[in-house]
Design a protein with these regions (language model features):
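Terminal helices and disordered tails flanking the catalytic cores of nucleotide-processing hydrolases
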Residues: 2-124, 285-378
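Acidic/His-rich, divalent-metal-binding segments that scaffold phosphate/diphosphate chemistry
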Residues: 82-215, 220-234
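Short leucine-rich amphipathic alpha-helices used at interfaces
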Residues: 37, 43-44, 142, 148-149, ...
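Short clusters of hydrophobic/aromatic residues that line enzyme substrate/ligand-binding pockets
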Residues: 46, 199-200, 206, 246-251, ...
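Alpha-helical scaffolding flanking metal-ion-dependent phosphate/phosphodiester catalytic sites
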Residues: 160, 183-194, 212-223, 227-308, ...
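Short, contiguous strand/loop micro-motifs
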Residues: 51-54, 151, 208, 250
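Short alpha-helical linear motifs
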Residues: 146-149, 201-209, 239, 259-263, ...
């Protein structure tokens, strides 16, 4: 997770009656652990960076478990709140992600050793994710909770895979094609297993020479998958070409536009977003709105404009249940998203900051009130 405000990527799913509501919890709001009080109920189960359960939903907070969360570098949690009784947040994706995360070290090791079975295992691990994304229902995707912990390779690969799947769904991919995209995105950085760990984990900015070494990882990834065999060209090209840029200034081959595989063009957007959203030793992470603007600004240069447009229509900036401050001096909670307006949700206001007092709740649709903007996440 990240340390500052507006931290994490989040996915909230508004599910139709045709989809199981397993994992959907009511009465939830997002709270920074630094502001977490005792005697409140955890609304969503919390996992560590190895995918292990730390605190189960329904647990009451205490000084001890709050300290435990801080020790495990958890910075944001969801707690129950009756003011948001009609706002449902789905945590099924967390379980799917956790199950996949547990398998990732074994999958990468087996791939590097040429074990064909590991490729099938990787596909099987993504099946639940693809089934989830392909399910019927309206999907509202917020840029807050894909990334639950500080950046490391396995988390980054899974988050990139999740984002890529949602983009693929927006682009009309069927389930079979989504599975191929998912495996390509999941394995896009497998070539980093051939790069020295001290370079991958360096606590500082890379030198020019070190960056040249790092740039070999797409080629190493292609070699690993070619040696494995049995994977389609689109899957391999997604791994090999994910650092190519739409204008031809990327690497390793300097491809441009449609010469870059569509899988790679999708993965490129997701890879950059998840990478800049992570804290680094040499720079602070981008807030979700900043990372979002970076993707939009790269349209036509770094990224395929048509995919950026799909990105814009697919991902929202502020999560359901987030407490936000508005430019008119009022604060409240995000209760609904507005499609095609990712930074202008519907907010249920509850507090007058200027007067320093609660107010009778009412809702503001920021699409209709263009003179009001979100100025921060509280």
């Amino acid at each position: 997770m990240y340390i500052d405000k507006s931290v994490q990527l989040q996915i909230n799913i508004e599910v139709s009656s045709g989809l199981s509501l397993k994992g959907v919890v009511e009465f939830m709001k997002m709270v920074f652990v630094r502001d977490l009080k005792t005697e409140v109920i955890i609304g969503k189960s919390i996992y560590n960076n190895a995918g292990k359960l730390l605190i189960k939903s329904g647990t009451k907070t205490s000084k001890e478990n709050i300290a435990f969360l801080k020790k495990n570098m958890v910075f944001i949690v969801y707690v129950e709140d009756e003011k948001l009784e009609d706002v449902k947040i789905d945590d099924e994706l967390d379980e799917i992600k956790s199950n996949t995360l547990e398998k990732m070290p074994e999958i990468f090791n087996n791939l590097c050793s040429g074990d064909r079975e590991s490729a099938r295992e990787a596909l099987e691990n993504m099946n639940n994710l693809v089934d989830y994304i392909s399910s019927e229902g309206d999907v509202n995707i917020n840029l807050y909770e894909l990334k639950t912990y500080d950046q490391y390779t396995y988390i980054h690969c899974i988050d990139t895979g999740i984002m890529a799947c949602f983009l693929g769904k927006r682009m009309g991919y069927n389930k079979e094609k989504l599975k191929k995209l998912a495996i390509s995105a999941l394995l896009h950085d497998v070539g980093k297993t051939k790069i020295p760990n001290e370079l991958i984990n360096k606590a500082g900015k890379l030198t020019d020479e070190e960056f040249k070494i790092l740039r070999f990882h797409p080629g190493y990834g292609k070699e690993i998958l070619d040696q494995l065999g049995g994977l389609e060209e689109d899957v391999v090209n997604g791994v090999y070409q994910h650092h190519e840029k739409y204008d031809g200034t990327g690497y390793p081959a300097g491809l441009k536009k449609d010469d870059i595989s569509e899988f790679a063009r999708i993965i490129s957007v997701c890879d950059v977003f998840t990478a800049v959203s992570a804290n680094r030793a040499y720079r602070k992470r981008f807030d979700p709105n900043e990372a979002y603007e970076l993707i939009l600004s790269g349209s036509g240069t770094m990224f395929d404009p048509s995919i950026v447009e799909r990105f814009r229509r697919t991902f929202f900036v502020y999560p359901l249940g987030a407490c936000v401050k508005l430019s008119n001096g009022i604060e409240g909670y995000v209760v609904k998203q507005n499609e095609n307006f990712p930074d202008r949700p519907i907010v249920r206001v509850t507090y007058d900051i200027k007067a320093d007092k609660p107010i009778s709740p009412y809702e503001i649709d920021l699409v209709e009130k263009y003179n009001i903007v979100i100025s921060g996440v509280i």
